[in-house]
Amino acid sequence: GDKVMPRTAEWESRWWSPIINAEHLQMRETAGIVDLTAFAYFDITGPSALAVVQKAALRQMDVAIGRVVYTPVLGPNGGFKSDLTIMRLGESHFRVVTGGAHGMADKKWFADLLPEDGSATIKDITSDYTTLGVWGPNARKIVQEVTSADMSNEAFKFSTCKEIDIKGVKVLASRISYVGDLGWEFYVPMADGPALWDALWESGKNHGMIPVGIGVYGTTGRLEKCYRAYGPELETEYTVVEAGMQTPKLKDADFVGKEAHVKHRSEKPAAMLCTLFVDDHTSSTGEKRYMMGNEPILTLDKQPITDSHGRRSYVTSAGSAPSLG
């Protein structure tokens, strides 16, 4: 309706569609199902599996079986190499879930940390698995109707995962969200993907669920919640502190980039990632124009803003925020 504003300028309309905003609003009001087949997955197993993921991850990985940890992965300089999710599936079994575009780079980073004695191995299962995500206020109702597992908040807490059965399909369910709404990611063997989709879709039709594309998942949904993305917000040149992702307490275990990160924590950051809300898109010509990312941020007298390292301020990601008006 009125919340779906048109874009008349050709440049910023290239990868934009009013359908994105419409899907977003429906997801926020009811629920949306997202095809996340493009994810990359690899399992790290063996007696030294914990040591490998501890070495790679900024966050604590010595957690209970069934915990899901979202973590930055740093380079030696303390800048970002990646951000990804790691699930602890067993005492010596961890599953890494990351974006498909960066999956091979992440796999090599972890593989390079494997011990030479073979006490930990890495297996790429990207071609074997697919993922569906269901999010929105009605997500719990939709899933609960097709499984005997208890999907209540008390029984299935945020940042946990467990195996459940959905209409005869064995599913690894992870309660995590990149769009800022209640919901789960469901991982199944590729051959079971259609059956899982059908089961969720049939249940979702009774609760207003619609298919939602990556424009919502990767842009409007995440930006409304100020979630960061590797590449636009998280990059090697900027630190965890500058990105606002430092933890209150640093784990004792060593990890790549720890020395640099400890130094960054003790210093005043030269730059800070923040969210800007543009309430007037009218340009000097009178036409409404919209940012797409990488635009410079200037002072009121049109001068560049430069930090103590000589880096100029710029827009990392930009997109609509339909639920915020």
Please provide the spans of the model-predicted regions.
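Conserved, structured C-terminal
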Residues: 1-15, 89-325
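Internal amphipathic helical hairpin motif
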Residues: 47-80, 139-169
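A generic structural motif
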Residues: 45, 74-76, 298-302
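Conserved hydrophobic/aromatic beta-strand scaffold that supports enzyme active sites
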Residues: 33, 41, 72, 85, ...
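Long, contiguous hydrophobic alpha-helical segments, chiefly transmembrane helices and signal peptides
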Residues: 24-27, 39, 56, 70-73, ...
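Well-ordered mid-protein domain cores that form the structural environment of catalytic cofactors
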Residues: 55, 59-113
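Acidic active-site catalytic centers that drive phospho-/nucleotidyl reactions
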Residues: 35, 83, 185
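Acidic, proline/glycine-enriched N-terminal capping motif
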Residues: 1-71, 79
